[in-house]
Amino acid sequence: MFSEIQEKIHSGEGITFQEAAYLSKAENLDILQILSMAAQVTANFANKKIDLCSIVNAKSGSCSEDCKFCAQSVYYATGCQTYPLLNSVAILEAAKRVEEKGIHRFALVTSGKNLSNRDFDEVIKIYQVLREKTSLQLCASLGLLDTSRALQLKKAGVSTYHHNLECAESFFKRICTTHTYQQRVATIKSAQSAGLKICSGGIISLGETMLQRLELAYELKALGVDSVPINVLNPILGTPLAGQQIMSSQDIIKTICLFRLILPTISLRFGGGIKESLGELRVLGFPAGINAVIIGNFLTTTGYQIDRELSVIRSMGLNIS
């Protein structure tokens, strides 16, 4: 079946679920074949260009939801830093620092199921300031969203809405019971209806099977998202997943390869947990399919220093787009 899949890849097609399931069983030398196929697709799509974005944790902690991986949930004692919505001065300062580093995309991320009307109105004002005082492409990750709010974000200058599915629908109730998978899907569709691009992916190594990872990839494909962040669980003390065993580096790279073969023309973005799970092996993620990176710190965990990561990316002959 390898040769048949290779022919399909040459024609620019994504692979089927059955083909992905077959490749997912590969071990050792066969993984190198999968990596080679994924590298070919990545080269054709990305042309050695890397899209970089950075985020600011604009409102932290006190989240009403019970996502079992999250340090910000009120259900778990994690010692997470808690603070209300940052003001426009603090956020503009963070945005300017990002822009000075040559990063062109910036997102506000807020904790909670969604924002109160008061906080949402304030966020709209903040985006208006960012649009006037920076040249950054603006993204938002504000929880559940309806079409009315999506249209307001679009008008304020936001181009992309981020809202992860987190995992396959068949696994979702294992990690969250306070809202439904369909509410997440509805948020994505609301943002799309307002003309926003969609950044949506998930977290791997939550305890799901490889087939459920593939299920997530095909659900994202069906939704027509534009960018897929791939996060690896970083177990947080105090959460129910604190003792969860993390996948091997080999399985993480194989998963990235399969996502690239399933989603040949969608940006695959390194998200959180990469530093802890892959370390220096993260460089293998780029030929495997990664053509975008969330750079800098995350919500409650630290990433690689921006200057160091930029140096690594450039040393691989990749161009920042």
Curated annotation (Swiss-Prot):
Concerning Pfam families, the annotation shows: BATS, Radical_SAM
Q: What InterPro entries does UniProt report for this protein, alphabetically?
A: Aldolase_TIM (IPR013785), BATS_dom (IPR010722), Biotin_synth/BioAB (IPR002684), Biotin_synthase (IPR024177), Elp3/MiaA/NifB-like_rSAM (IPR006638), rSAM (IPR007197)
Alphabetical UniProt keywords: 2Fe-2S, 4Fe-4S, Biotin biosynthesis, Iron, Iron-sulfur, Metal-binding, S-adenosyl-L-methionine, Transferase
Chain positions recorded as [4Fe-4S] cluster binding sites: 63, 67, 70
* Gene3D superfamilies found in the cross-reference section: Aldolase class I (3.20.20.70)
Biological process (GO) annotations held by this record are: biotin biosynthetic process
How many cofactor units bind, and how? Binds 1 [4Fe-4S] cluster. The cluster is coordinated with 3 cysteines and an exchangeable S-adenosyl-L-methionine. Binds 1 [2Fe-2S] cluster. The cluster is coordinated with 3 cysteines and 1 arginine.
Q: Any idea which positions bind [2Fe-2S] cluster? A: 139, 199, 269
The enzyme's first-digit EC class, named in words, is: transferase
The cofactors it requires, by name, are: [4Fe-4S] cluster; [2Fe-2S] cluster
Instruction: Indicate the segments forming the Radical SAM core domain, all copies.
Output: 45-275
**Which reactions is this enzyme annotated as catalysing?**
(4R,5S)-dethiobiotin + (sulfur carrier)-SH + 2 reduced [2Fe-2S]-[ferredoxin] + 2 S-adenosyl-L-methionine = (sulfur carrier)-H + biotin + 2 5'-deoxyadenosine + 2 L-methionine + 2 oxidized [2Fe-2S]-[ferredoxin]
Which residue ranges run through the membrane?
A: none
Q: What SUPFAM superfamilies is this protein classified in? A: Radical SAM enzymes
EC number(s) reported in the record: 2.8.1.6
SMART domains attached to this UniProt entry: BATS, Elp3
List the residue ranges forming a coiled coil, or say none: none
Q: In which pathway does it act?
A: Cofactor biosynthesis; biotin biosynthesis; biotin from 7,8-diaminononanoate: step 2/2
Family stated for the protein in its record = Belongs to the radical SAM superfamily. Biotin synthase family.
Q: What does this protein do?
A: Catalyzes the conversion of dethiobiotin (DTB) to biotin by the insertion of a sulfur atom into dethiobiotin via a radical-based mechanism.
Quaternary assembly: Homodimer.
Q: What is this protein called?
A: Biotin synthase
Q: Could you tell me which species this protein originates from?
A: Desulforamulus reducens (strain ATCC BAA-1160 / DSM 100696 / MI-1) (Desulfotomaculum reducens)
- Gene that encodes the chain: bioB
